[in-house]
């Protein structure tokens, strides 16, 4: 049985494109494979931003203060597939997701610095990025403004996750026709996806 960690970050709990696509993805896997899904909703259960207390706790090995970070890292290692939902906010990701990233990007836990450069420790995992974007960012004048997809891929690669599938609905806020076309493409992509 494959284990999936389903991470949600959209502040729109209803009418969220990324949440709808994420739900469709999980439903697809449940209907075609034996899977166990754990959900981490970063809006309903927000992760504390790192701060001076967090840095001091790391320096002093204060496990009480690091408990949340340790739990989030444990979830990464326990699951085979990490499905991350992210709408694009201000050309990037929601702050809730950034806080999660800051809590899992911990040297000697999810990556090491070696003589040959950084080495990711979260190996043999697959990631699925479930992205939504109000505009078209894959081409044209807005392309250089997309700090969402490449950032998430870079983070995942850095910690050792190199098998990454991107499911992206673009232009969902432009007009109904573009939105519908994009959602149909995503629907087909999900149908063709296996784990």
UniProtKB/Swiss-Prot annotation:
EC number: 1.6.5.-, 1.7.1.17
Residues reported to bind FMN: 10, 16-18, 88-91
Cofactor: FMN
Cited Gene3D superfamilies: 3.40.50.360
InterPro entries, A to Z: Flavodoxin_fold, Flavoprotein-like_sf, FMN-dep_NADH:Q_OxRdtase_AzoR1, NADH:quinone_OxRdtase_FMN_depd
Keyword Ribosomal protein tagged: no
Cofactor details (free text): Binds 1 FMN per subunit.
Reactions this protein catalyses: 2 a quinone + NADH + H(+) = 2 a 1,4-benzosemiquinone + NAD(+); N,N-dimethyl-1,4-phenylenediamine + anthranilate + 2 NAD(+) = 2-(4-dimethylaminophenyl)diazenylbenzoate + 2 NADH + 2 H(+)
Broad enzyme group: oxidoreductase
Keyword entries, A-Z: Flavoprotein, FMN, NAD, Oxidoreductase
Signal sequence range: none
Entry keyword annotation includes DNA damage: no
GO-annotated molecular function: electron transfer activity; FMN binding; oxidoreductase activity, acting on NAD(P)H as acceptor; oxidoreductase activity, acting on NAD(P)H, quinone or similar compound as acceptor
Taxonomy, superkingdom: Bacteria
Pfam families associated with the record: Flavodoxin_2
SUPFAM superfamilies: Flavoproteins (SSF52218)
Quaternary structure and interacting proteins, as annotated: Homodimer.
Family, as annotated: Belongs to the azoreductase type 1 family.
Matching HAMAP family: Azoreductase_type1
Function of the protein: Quinone reductase that provides resistance to thiol-specific stress caused by electrophilic quinones. Also exhibits azoreductase activity. Catalyzes the reductive cleavage of the azo bond in aromatic azo compounds to the corresponding amines.
Name of the protein described by the UniProt record: FMN-dependent NADH:quinone oxidoreductase
Gene (name only): azoR
